[in-house]
């Protein structure tokens, strides 16, 4: 039996990325894997640098009995100090997803997307193209949503990001795509899905300009994001989110990138590579058919982890 401790902050993306690795290890390993999850919350202490958090945790867990843990995986900045403290208490192998921001060489492996690597890659770093995607999420459906859909029409989804540290969207950048989708709605069922970052005024303007029969999500507590990736024939996605683009490309569906001007250079470079590799396209007047090798970075990462862990 192989024991894994997964440590995350309260972000859903952190949990999903840890799960992507855990589920793939379970799939390809011959050993039985048991997983324990730990969500960490530090309140005001979370604003401290990781080196200070680590010092505090070493004292806090100084007398904790040694536990049987074979592998520790963590995601989220404040989870990295917990990872190292429990590694010392258990002699487990460990791995952190994304930049731990301290003591990098004390992690057996660090999983980092290429767009976040600024210098030469360290020996303990496993690089990925885009973000890790939990492929089991594609299997999750929503009966409430399925009842709303037109079974006779193929689907086109428009995934809309929003504002944050890395991007800012203005409605004019979406307007042309909305007009295109209005025209395509005679043949296809069009579904819009907003992110948590989408400003309210953008949502209102999209709903105002779109054909009234189009569907808009999330609705209350229902967000069929993964279902839409699974059932859509075509996916339009704004260029402000590497994670949304990575999720879309992991579906193998035909992806159109909707350009956004105010985005960080690393995001712009990522979308440019996607377009150059012809994995996705920018809409040029008609829907096209093309094939590409869908993203499967989790499998590549886990093949390397299997060697490190002797699984």
Language model features: what each stretch is:
Residues 6-130:
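Active-site and donor-binding regions of nucleotide-sugar-utilizing enzymes
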Residues 11-14, 225-267:
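A donor-sugar binding/catalytic signature common to diverse glycosyltransferases
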Residues 271-311:
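Leloir-type glycosyltransferase catalytic cores
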